[in-house]
Protein backbone atom coordinates (compact mmCIF):
# COMPACT_ATOMS: atom_id res chain seq x y z
CA UNK A 1 0.00 0.00 0.00
CA UNK A 2 1.28 3.44 -0.91
CA UNK A 3 1.32 6.14 1.74
CA UNK A 4 -1.96 8.06 1.92
CA UNK A 5 -2.06 11.65 3.10
CA UNK A 6 -5.27 12.96 4.64
CA UNK A 7 -6.08 16.47 5.84
CA UNK A 8 -9.15 17.11 7.99
CA UNK A 9 -10.52 20.67 7.77
CA UNK A 10 -12.98 22.68 9.85
CA UNK A 11 -13.44 26.39 10.49
CA UNK A 12 -10.88 27.18 13.19
CA UNK A 13 -8.98 23.90 13.61
CA UNK A 14 -9.72 23.80 17.34
CA UNK A 15 -12.65 21.37 17.63
CA UNK A 16 -13.75 19.09 14.81
CA UNK A 17 -10.71 18.67 12.58
CA UNK A 18 -8.15 18.03 15.35
CA UNK A 19 -10.61 15.52 16.82
CA UNK A 20 -10.96 13.80 13.43
CA UNK A 21 -7.16 13.74 13.15
CA UNK A 22 -6.87 12.04 16.56
CA UNK A 23 -9.63 9.52 15.85
CA UNK A 24 -8.22 8.52 12.47
CA UNK A 25 -4.69 8.40 13.89
CA UNK A 26 -5.89 5.93 16.54
CA UNK A 27 -7.59 3.69 13.96
CA UNK A 28 -4.48 3.68 11.80
CA UNK A 29 -2.25 2.97 14.80
CA UNK A 30 -4.46 0.16 16.09
CA UNK A 31 -4.16 -1.47 12.67
CA UNK A 32 -0.37 -1.15 12.64
CA UNK A 33 -0.35 1.18 9.64
CA UNK A 34 1.08 4.39 11.06
CA UNK A 35 3.88 4.42 8.49
CA UNK A 36 1.34 4.22 5.65
CA UNK A 37 -0.49 7.44 6.51
CA UNK A 38 0.23 11.12 6.88
CA UNK A 39 -2.60 12.66 8.88
CA UNK A 40 -3.05 16.34 9.70
CA UNK A 41 -5.74 18.95 10.25
CA UNK A 42 -6.23 22.62 9.43
CA UNK A 43 -8.78 25.41 9.66
CA UNK A 44 -10.22 27.72 7.06
CA UNK A 45 -9.53 30.68 9.36
CA UNK A 46 -6.22 31.63 10.95
CA UNK A 47 -7.89 33.15 14.01
CA UNK A 48 -6.67 30.39 16.36
CA UNK A 49 -3.28 29.81 14.69
CA UNK A 50 -0.86 28.08 17.05
CA UNK A 51 -3.47 27.30 19.72
CA UNK A 52 -4.26 23.88 21.12
CA UNK A 53 -7.72 22.45 20.55
CA UNK A 54 -10.57 24.00 22.52
CA UNK A 55 -10.35 22.98 26.19
CA UNK A 56 -13.84 21.45 26.09
CA UNK A 57 -12.96 19.30 23.08
CA UNK A 58 -9.75 18.20 24.82
CA UNK A 59 -11.79 17.29 27.92
CA UNK A 60 -14.35 15.18 26.06
CA UNK A 61 -11.64 13.64 23.89
CA UNK A 62 -9.66 12.64 26.99
CA UNK A 63 -12.76 10.93 28.43
CA UNK A 64 -12.52 8.57 25.45
CA UNK A 65 -8.77 8.18 25.63
CA UNK A 66 -7.76 10.68 22.95
CA UNK A 67 -5.06 13.26 23.58
CA UNK A 68 -5.32 16.31 21.35
CA UNK A 69 -1.86 17.84 21.01
CA UNK A 70 -2.27 19.45 17.58
CA UNK A 71 -1.71 23.20 17.32
CA UNK A 72 -4.13 25.01 15.04
CA UNK A 73 -2.95 26.04 11.61
CA UNK A 74 -4.73 27.64 8.68
CA UNK A 75 -5.38 25.76 5.45
CA UNK A 76 -2.81 26.67 2.79
CA UNK A 77 -3.14 26.33 -0.97
CA UNK A 78 -0.04 24.12 -0.86
CA UNK A 79 -2.12 21.58 1.07
CA UNK A 80 -3.66 20.60 -2.27
CA UNK A 81 -0.18 19.46 -3.35
CA UNK A 82 0.66 17.80 -0.05
CA UNK A 83 -2.49 15.73 0.60
CA UNK A 84 -4.37 13.04 -1.32
CA UNK A 85 -7.66 13.72 0.46
CA UNK A 86 -8.93 16.95 2.03
CA UNK A 87 -11.98 16.27 4.17
CA UNK A 88 -14.29 19.10 5.26
CA UNK A 89 -16.67 18.94 8.20
CA UNK A 90 -19.58 20.95 6.77
CA UNK A 91 -20.80 22.62 3.59
CA UNK A 92 -19.23 25.94 4.56
CA UNK A 93 -15.83 24.23 4.76
CA UNK A 94 -16.43 22.38 1.50
CA UNK A 95 -17.48 25.57 -0.32
CA UNK A 96 -14.43 27.45 1.00
CA UNK A 97 -12.12 24.61 -0.04
CA UNK A 98 -13.65 24.43 -3.52
CA UNK A 99 -13.23 28.20 -3.87
CA UNK A 100 -9.51 27.76 -3.18
CA UNK A 101 -9.12 24.84 -5.60
CA UNK A 102 -7.49 26.08 -8.81
CA UNK A 103 -7.84 22.89 -10.84
CA UNK A 104 -10.25 20.00 -11.22
CA UNK A 105 -7.54 17.75 -9.76
CA UNK A 106 -7.48 19.86 -6.59
CA UNK A 107 -11.27 19.98 -6.42
CA UNK A 108 -11.45 16.19 -6.76
CA UNK A 109 -9.42 15.82 -3.53
CA UNK A 110 -12.22 17.42 -1.47
CA UNK A 111 -14.63 15.17 0.46
CA UNK A 112 -17.36 15.59 3.09
CA UNK A 113 -16.63 13.86 6.40
CA UNK A 114 -20.19 12.61 6.85
CA UNK A 115 -20.09 10.83 3.49
CA UNK A 116 -17.97 8.19 5.23
CA UNK A 117 -20.42 7.58 8.08
CA UNK A 118 -21.54 3.96 8.31
CA UNK A 119 -23.95 3.80 11.25
CA UNK A 120 -24.91 7.41 11.89
CA UNK A 121 -26.70 9.69 9.46
CA UNK A 122 -25.96 13.40 9.38
CA UNK A 123 -25.74 16.14 6.78
CA UNK A 124 -22.63 17.64 8.38
CA UNK A 125 -20.41 17.51 11.44
CA UNK A 126 -21.83 20.40 13.49
CA UNK A 127 -19.53 22.93 15.09
CA UNK A 128 -19.83 22.40 18.87
CA UNK A 129 -18.00 25.63 19.75
CA UNK A 130 -21.08 27.64 20.77
CA UNK A 131 -23.08 24.72 22.15
CA UNK A 132 -23.19 22.61 25.27
CA UNK A 133 -21.45 19.45 26.40
CA UNK A 134 -23.68 17.11 24.40
CA UNK A 135 -22.58 18.83 21.19
CA UNK A 136 -18.99 17.75 21.81
CA UNK A 137 -20.07 14.18 22.56
CA UNK A 138 -22.17 14.10 19.38
CA UNK A 139 -19.27 15.37 17.28
CA UNK A 140 -16.97 12.66 18.64
CA UNK A 141 -19.64 10.02 17.93
CA UNK A 142 -19.94 11.23 14.33
CA UNK A 143 -16.18 11.40 13.84
CA UNK A 144 -15.59 7.92 15.25
CA UNK A 145 -18.19 6.53 12.84
CA UNK A 146 -16.98 8.52 9.84
CA UNK A 147 -13.29 7.77 10.46
CA UNK A 148 -14.05 4.04 10.69
CA UNK A 149 -15.91 4.34 7.39
CA UNK A 150 -13.04 6.29 5.85
CA UNK A 151 -10.57 3.62 6.91
CA UNK A 152 -12.77 0.93 5.32
CA UNK A 153 -13.23 3.09 2.20
CA UNK A 154 -9.48 3.21 1.74
CA UNK A 155 -9.55 -0.62 1.67
CA UNK A 156 -6.82 -0.86 4.22
List the model feature ranges, each with a label.
Residues 1-82, 152-156:
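Conserved active-site segments centered on acidic
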Residues 46-51, 79, 89, 102, ...:
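Acidic pyrophosphate-coordinating catalytic loop
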Residues 85, 91-156:
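Phosphate-binding/catalytic loops
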